[in-house]
Each structure stands twice: as C-alpha cells, then as structure tokens.
Amino acid sequence: VTIQVRHVTDAEIVPKGFDPYDEAVFIFAELWPALNSDSTSTPQPVPPVRRGVFLLPNILTTGCLACGFFAIVSAIHGDFARAGQAIFAAMVFDGLDGRVARWTRTESVFGKEFDSLADMVSFGVAPALVAYQWGVAAIAEYGSGWGRFGWIASFFYAVCAALRLARFNARASTADKRYFEGLPSPSAAGLVAAFVWFSSEWLEPNLAGLALSFGVCAIAGVLMISAIPYQSIKQIDWNARVKFFYFVIVPLSLALVVANPPPMLLLLFTCYVSLAPLMWVWRKLRRSVGA
C-alpha cells in the first residue's frame, strides 16, 4: 500500500477573504449574551393569554347554542317567526366564534368540539323540530300516514346533519379549504328556517305546503351528506379587488333582506343551495359530451 503525503498550503485551508480578527469579533458577539447571563436563572415564562380572551370564542359558541335552544322553545309555543330568527342569529354567532378564535390565537381542541356540538343543536336538531312542529298540528287532519312521513323527514334531516358534522371534523385537516364537501349544516338550517318562517306568514298549512316543508328537509339532508362541492365564504379574499357588480348586488341584497326578511332569505338560500348541484350536473354533462 502506497501512502502519498502532500503538503497543504495555507491558501487551501483558509478561504479567500478570511479575516481572523473579524471572525473572532463575530463569534464573541454571538456568545456574549450567553456568557453575560446568569446560568442559574430560569428563563422567563411567556405571559399567558388572558382568560377573558380565551373564553370569548366559547361565549360566542354558547350564544349559538342558546339561539338553537330558543328556536326549539319558540317552535313549541307556535312562534315560528321567532324560531326562524333565532336560527339565523345562531348562524351569526357560529360565523363569529371561529374568526374570533383565530384573531385572538385562542383556537383549541375543546373549542372545536364545543362548536361542533352547538352546531348539531342549532343547525341539526332545531331546524328539524321547527319544521316538524310547524306541520304536526295540521298534518294530523290528513291522516296518520302523513304524520309518519313528517316525522321521518325531520329525523332524516337531523341524522344527515350529524353525519355532515362528523365528516367535516374527520376530514378537517385534509379537506380543500376553498370548498365544502356537501351542503354546510348552517346553510341547510337557513334554508329550512327561511321556508318555515315564510310559510308561517304567507302560506296556509295545507297538505301541499306541509309536504313541501318536509320535502325541503329531505332534500337539505341529502345535500348535506352528498359530495357536491360548495364554495366556502371563509376563503374569499375581501381585501382583493372585486368587480363593481358586487358593490351593487351585495348592498341591494342586504337592503331587500332588511325590508322583507322571510321571502328574501328564502330566495337567497334557495339560490345558494341549488346553484352548486346545478353546476355539478352541468360539469358532468359537459364531460360526458366531450368524452
């Protein structure tokens, strides 16, 4: 075995432009805080988030739950206008609690679970009971078969809402944030609440109206557990440039809703609920024709 020994020059060891004095100053400056600190002292703890800030999102979630409970109580007493208003108020609280948690950096697993349970009451159980209670008093006049149909349709809506929330929680980490998989439960609740509110003030509880009410529950339930993508409002960049068209439509829609809430809310939620399935069918037809 032959071993070759080669003399290495200083230029090969020390890179070009290296200044030992500058490097020593740099290393000393980096080490000075550690050398100057007291080794026995403990690091200062990070100041905790104030309890009031941590509770704020959960207080909003509690407001959502309270509105759902109030909607159920109002429906039992026959006040369907207030029941519908309570469900829409629950939607406002539900839209605020998550945003407040992100703004204050107080998101937690407890908050997410609490929000899901509140959504089940306000957007799952409450709309189903409101729709059933609106028709249960009059539907008995048309025979017991219609009563069973109303009970099954309302229960089907509640079950679909539970499945929708469970699927959302299970796929929250991997889902596309731009879209919802299936109709969101607040939107489904808004459709049912708007229909009952509108029907209680504008329609008589005849057989056609009652059948349509429970049909709305069944359709909303099917759309909740479907895989049809719905646009997520949470991912809209409100700071980006928007067309002048939106500056006209949005204020006009709000003005019409304030002027006459029941029909306008029913129209808005019907458009949102039906637009995604229509677009989904349109894309399927285009693909089949192109193939």
Where are these regions (language model features)?
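Topogenic membrane-insertion module of multi-pass membrane proteins
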Residues: 2-95, 279
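Helix-coil boundary and interhelical linker segments in multi-pass alpha-helical membrane proteins
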Residues: 70-85, 127-152, 195-212, 258-263
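C-terminal membrane-associated helical module and adjoining short loops/tails
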Residues: 3, 11-13, 17-45, 177-291
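Active-site His/Glu-centered metal-binding helix of metallohydrolases
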Residues: 66, 92, 96, 100, ...
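"…together with the soluble PPM/PP2C metallo-phosphatase catalytic core" -> "…together
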Residues: 44, 49-60, 67-80, 143-172, ...
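Alpha-helical transmembrane segments of polytopic integral membrane proteins
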Residues: 69-72, 89, 93, 127, ...
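Multi-pass membrane catalytic core of lipid/isoprenoid biosynthesis enzymes
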Residues: 56-61, 103-165, 196
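Select subsegments of transmembrane alpha-helices in polytopic membrane proteins
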Residues: 55-61, 116-123, 181-189, 242-246
